[in-house]
C-alpha cells in the first residue's frame, strides 16, 4: 500500500525550489493523492503547483510561520500543521477571509492535555480536578475539536481521502 498523504520537505529557502518540485513530481509518480509543502518564507507559496496543498506551520511556542501577507494563500487548499485548536479557531476565519480553504489540520495538544486529565469542550480547555480516563478523554476532545473547527469554518471538515 502507498500513503494517501505526503508532506514534502519544508520549503525554507528559494534555493530549495528545484529539490521541492522534484520531490512533488516523485510523490505524484508514486500515486500519492494528497501532497503538501510547508512554505516557510514570504513569497514561497507562488512556487508551489496549484494542485499541491500548502501546509501552514501554525505559530506556537516551539515554531511556526505565517507570511507577512496572508493573501499569499488566496485560492489555495491548506493543511494546518501543529498549534492548538484554539489557535486554529482564531486562524481559520482569517485564512478564509483571504480566500483560502482549510482542508485539514493535525496536532497533538489534545493528547498531551489528556495526560493531565484535561479535555477540550465548547471551544476551551477544561479540567475539573477529577481523574479522567486517558483514551476516553483523547477521543472526547478529538470529537469536540472537530465540532468546533466545523462550526468556525462553516462547513464539515473534509477527509484526506475525499477526491
Located regions from the model:
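Active-site beta->alpha loop and helix N-cap motifs at the rims of alpha/beta catalytic domains
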Residues: 1-59
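Conserved beta-strand positions
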Residues: 8, 56, 80, 105-107
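Alpha/beta catalytic cores of nucleotide-metabolism and tRNA/nucleoside-modifying enzymes
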Residues: 22, 28-29, 71-78, 86-163
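Short catalytic/ligand-binding loop motif for oxyanion handling, primarily in non-cytosolic enzymes
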Residues: 15-16, 45-47, 63-65, 87-90, ...
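Donor nucleotide-activated moiety binding/catalytic core segment of transferases
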Residues: 51-79, 88-90
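Short, flexible loop/turn elements at secondary-structure junctions
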Residues: 41, 58-60, 82-84, 109
Amino acid at each position: 500500500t502507498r500513503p494517501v498523504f505526503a508532506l514534502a520537505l519544508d520549503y525554507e529557502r528559494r534555493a530549495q525550489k528545484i529539490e521541492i518540485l522534484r520531490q512533488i513530481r516523485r510523490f505524484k509518480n508514486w500515486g500519492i493523492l494528497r501532497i503538501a509543502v510547508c512554505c516557510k518564507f514570504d513569497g514561497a507559496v507562488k512556487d508551489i503547483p496549484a494542485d499541491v496543498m500548502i501546509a501552514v506551520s501554525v505559530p506556537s511556542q516551539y515554531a511556526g510561520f505565517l507570511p507577512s501577507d496572508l493573501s499569499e494563500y488566496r485560492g489555495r487548499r491548506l493543511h494546518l500543521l501543529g498549534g492548538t485548536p484554539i489557535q486554529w479557531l482564531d486562524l481559520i476565519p482569517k485564512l478564509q477571509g483571504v480566500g483560502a480553504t482549510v482542508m485539514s489540520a493535525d496536532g497533538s495538544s489534545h493528547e498531551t492535555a489528556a495526560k493531565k486529565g484535561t479535555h477540550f469542550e465548547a471551544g476551551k480547555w477544561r479540567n475539573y480536578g477529577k481523574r479522567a480516563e486517558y483514551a476516553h478523554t483523547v477521543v472526547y476532545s478529538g470529537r469536540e475539536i472537530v465540532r468546533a473547527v466545523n462550526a468556525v469554518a462553516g462547513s464539515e471538515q473534509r477527509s484526506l481521502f475525499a477526491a
